[in-house]
Amino acid sequence: LALHRSRQTKECHDTHDTTTEAPGDDPAAVGARMLNAEDNRLLTGVGPDTPMGRMLRGYWHPVLRSARLEADGAPVRVGLLGQKFVAFRVTHGEVGFVDEACPHRCTSLALARNEDNGLRCIFHGWKIDVTGRVVDVPTEPRACRAAFAESVPRPRYHVRESGGIVWVCLQQGQPPAFPDFEFHALPESQRETRIAVMHCNWVQAMESVLDSAHLGLLHQGQLQRAPADASMADHVRTVFGNTQQDTAPQLEVEPQGYGFREGALRQLPDGRRYVQIREFVAPYYSLLPAAPTVARRFIVASVPIDDEWTAQWFIHFSLDGPLTPELLAERWQHAPENPDNFYENPGDIGNLWGQDREAMRNGHFSGFPGRHIFHEDFIVQEAMGPI
């Protein structure tokens, strides 16, 4: 992905160098740099037997907010990389993560009883502990139950809780190093997480976050209210205003060991240049630009559920104090309150996601007034088709 984006822009080896070359406008050269159908299939296929799927299984993935799991509570279904799982918190508080299908007859363990530090299937009573090991098979003769249970093959996945999130690595054997983001060390009052589930592949979702050019176009309706909106923080108002001044930013990419650093350079009317810098951390994390004077950070992670569905995580945290109710109200204005899917019931292509043509005639660019700014992104991503 970093290579693909660097082909589209001039690689910037000196981030302080303000002289850049304009990309060529030869249509054949531009076409040669574009993603083709074969590359697209390679990137979007995330199942266990695909190249991308095998690569992604070597990473830790956020799968649930920790708050969703209660000790001895209902298991929660989780889709990740084209497979189906259930997560559960056992009696003593530890989190388990296992294949959804019971190893006996493949019925869903989302229906299982969660008790006595394990899941017990309601069909034949087989019990699976927090590590995924089968520990009881009451349908077998007592004399051989223990040996039979031990013989049942069952993959075991790596699970860790940190930063209010349940993380999972599907790789068998030794897991990789855990991602050391700043928010892991912060108290709950200084961080919050919300998730949006959308019907498009993870690459479409991820590239939208990295794409600075659309800010002054798709989000015009949001930007137009910025100068007069007293509830909007000064640095946010500045960002919105500057992105409208130049809708064709020049992109510069600097490869890094963790991914790449991307700069979007805009020319302002007074001769200054406005630069937004994003960090991309493999395999799908985008660290959004932040004002130098603000100690708040925003990470977006585009986690593949399968080839056609994505759970996009929005991790917001403050390094210098609690996230106040007022700040969160501003950040999530017009967003549904469900933190586990603030994009629920959005509509679809059948009703054009509720687009308001009257609002468009009255000057709203996208036709989605009263919607959270991220909803505009989700809608155009879904409108591309799932792949």
Question: Where are the model-predicted features located?
Answer:
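Short, Lys/Arg-enriched N-terminal segments with co-localized hydrophobic residues
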Residues: 2-14
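Generic detector of low-complexity/intrinsically disordered segments
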Residues: 3-5, 37, 45, 253, ...
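C-terminal catalytic domain of Rieske-type non-heme iron oxygenases
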Residues: 11-29, 48, 94, 167, ...
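Rieske [2Fe-2S] iron-sulfur-binding domain
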Residues: 13, 17-22, 64-191, 250, ...
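Zn-dependent metallo-beta-lactamase
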Residues: 21-84
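Short low-complexity stretches enriched in small and charged residues
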Residues: 32-45, 53-54, 77-78, 86, ...
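A short, structural micro-pattern
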Residues: 57, 153, 160-162, 296, ...
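Short beta-strand or tight-loop elements
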Residues: 59-61, 81-83, 155, 258, ...
